[in-house]
């Protein structure tokens, strides 16, 4: 059994939500609030509706409940859009509706390798950039990022652009099946 990592890193585009935030979205953004106060869908000024993948709140919540540090690792060239929508999306965690951004402990952006994102994030979280010093996983939709495995990071390939990371994929990761 793989079990829980120390750090779980998530790409954003096609891993948290089904679009490229730096090309599909233009602010301002209108939140669509559900009856329980969550905001799982936003609408951009062009009318494009964006809903986070349905299992993301459950996956992130389970990781947080088990003491895992959460990190974004995104190559987006428009981090200000990603940051804004992470603050607008709201999910229920520990009985409270909170911005999705609040679930993350570290944010890494920029057009560079995921290895760079992970090293810098680890440096900020633990004052070390040695990727083998912690148990780390990366959820990502781009197979090229499997290169992180050369550095001891478990790569969890999110193959389904319509549904994103499913609870089953997540459970398969935890049990060592992927």
Curated annotation (Swiss-Prot):
Keywords in alphabetical order: Cytoplasm, Hydrolase, Magnesium, Metal-binding, Nucleus, Protein phosphatase
Pfam families: Acid_PPase (PF12689)
Annotated GO CC locations: cytoplasm; nucleus
Places the protein is found: Cytoplasm; Nucleus
Enzyme class: hydrolase
Residues involved in phosphate binding: 12-13, 74-75
Entry annotated with the keyword Protease: no
Main location: cytoplasm
EC number: 3.1.3.48
List of catalytic residues: 11, 13
Residues the record lists as binding substrate: 75
Stored NCBIfam families: HAD-SF-IIIC, MDP-1
Described purpose of this protein according to its UniProt entry: Magnesium-dependent phosphatase which may act as a tyrosine phosphatase.
Family: Belongs to the HAD-like hydrolase superfamily.
Other remarks in the entry: Present with 6190 molecules/cell in log phase SD medium.
Protein's UniProt name: Putative magnesium-dependent phosphatase YER134C
């Amino acid at each position: 059994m793989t079990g829980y990592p120390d750090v779980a890193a998530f790409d954003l585009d096609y891993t948290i939500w089904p679009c490229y935030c730096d090309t599909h979205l233009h602010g301002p953004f209108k939140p669509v609030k559900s009856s329980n106060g969550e905001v799982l869908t936003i609408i951009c000024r062009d009318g494009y509706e964006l809903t986070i993948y349905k299992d993301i709140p459950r996956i992130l919540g389970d990781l947080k409940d088990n003491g895992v540090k959460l990190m974004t690792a995104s190559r987006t060239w428009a981090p200000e859009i990603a940051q804004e929508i992470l603050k607008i999306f709201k999910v229920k965690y520990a009985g409270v509706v909170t911005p999705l951004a609040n679930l993350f402990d570290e944010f890494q952006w920029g057009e560079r390798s995921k290895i760079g994102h992970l090293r810098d994030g680890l440096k900020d979280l633990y004052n070390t950039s040695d990727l083998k010093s912690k148990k780390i996983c990366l959820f990502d939709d781009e197979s090229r990022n499997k290169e992180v495995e050369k550095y001891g990071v478990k790569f969890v390939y999110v193959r389904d652009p319509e549904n994103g990371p499913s609870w089953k994929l997540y459970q398969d990761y935890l049990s060592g099946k992927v």
